[in-house]
Amino acid sequence: MQARLLIPILFSVFILSACGTLTGIPSHGGGKRFAVEQELVAASARAAVKDMDLQALHGRKVALYIATMGDQGSGSLTGGRYSIDALIRGEYINSPAVRTDYTYPRYETTAETTSGGLTGLTTSLSTLNAPALSRTQSDGSGSKSSLGLNIGGMGDYRNETLTTNPRDTAFLSHLVQTVFFLRGIDVVSPANADTDVFINIDVFGTIRNRTEMHLYNAETLKAQTKLEYFAVDRTNKKLLIKPKTNAFEAAYKENYALWMGPYKVSKGIKPTEGLMVDFSDIQPYGNHMGNSAPSVEADNSHEGYGYSDEAVRRHRQGQP
């Protein structure tokens, strides 16, 4: 009865041990990106921007204000990827019966003594303490078998998060301007705009997963872009577009069997869960909107898109 219970318990321990997914929490970047990561980051950004509903801005001249969460950093995975070797080691040895026979040499000593007409004869038999011959016989067959599994664990993750990469911000801003242009919406400077459009990029990075389940293994790289946007009419301070959220995830996955392969590689993009907190349910105090528009960071105003607080202030005061 105990043996019947022990077998499934041992089998379950073997199957479940070292099975899991290690998920780092890196920001993308930190050195030269490889092509797959570039493709995923660009795809998620393009999908999020392309899905923006801008119909309410048709025929208007808009000024864009884009703020991006810090997204540059570095990360590395070390260790992991088990190999069938020897951590759980069992050994069975079947040894044959062995018999050894020894033959020791013997020698005889004779001594004769004569004294006063008396003669004595002494004879002794001795055996040397070293065999002159040994014979070993083995009966039956012998065998030896072993089984082992070496598990390197799921590895160690190290990451470093830095500041926003200006080139990433520039790329994302150019995507936004491209979509606005293709939708027939004019993007102009704040001095010539009748509408302000604010875009907050909350998530713009990658996630790497490693899954180890003995027979099945997988490496997964995901890129996510999550943004919230809204538009304000400068004349009456009304919201032309209430706060809306777009979130997309692009993924690249390699499937392995015993870490041999990959036997399958897949790529895809899909909408993902939105922001943990958004502003879609915020209502103004009273019956009027505020007189001041949100501002963006000064270091986000470069190359003709996005404007600093000082530029917005001068425009509202009528200064050049």
Curated annotation (Swiss-Prot):
Q: Where in the cell is it found?
A: Cell outer membrane
Enumerate the residue ranges of region (Disordered).
Answer: 288-320
Signal peptide segment: 1-18
Bilayer topology term? Lipid-anchor
Can the keyword Membrane be found in this entry's annotation? yes
Q: Where is the lipid attached (S-diacylglycerol cysteine)?
A: 19
GO biological process, alphabetically ordered = cell adhesion
What GO CC terms are in its UniProt record? Answer: cell outer membrane
Question: Which residues are covalently lipidated (N-palmitoyl cysteine)?
Answer: 19
* Keywords in alphabetical order: Cell adhesion, Cell outer membrane, Lipoprotein, Membrane, Palmitate, Signal, Virulence
Does the keyword field hold Lipoprotein?
yes
Q: Which domain of life is it from?
A: Bacteria
Instruction: Identify its protein family.
Output: Belongs to the MafA family.
Q: What is this protein called?
A: Adhesin MafA 1
What species does this protein belong to? Neisseria meningitidis serogroup A / serotype 4A (strain DSM 15465 / Z2491)
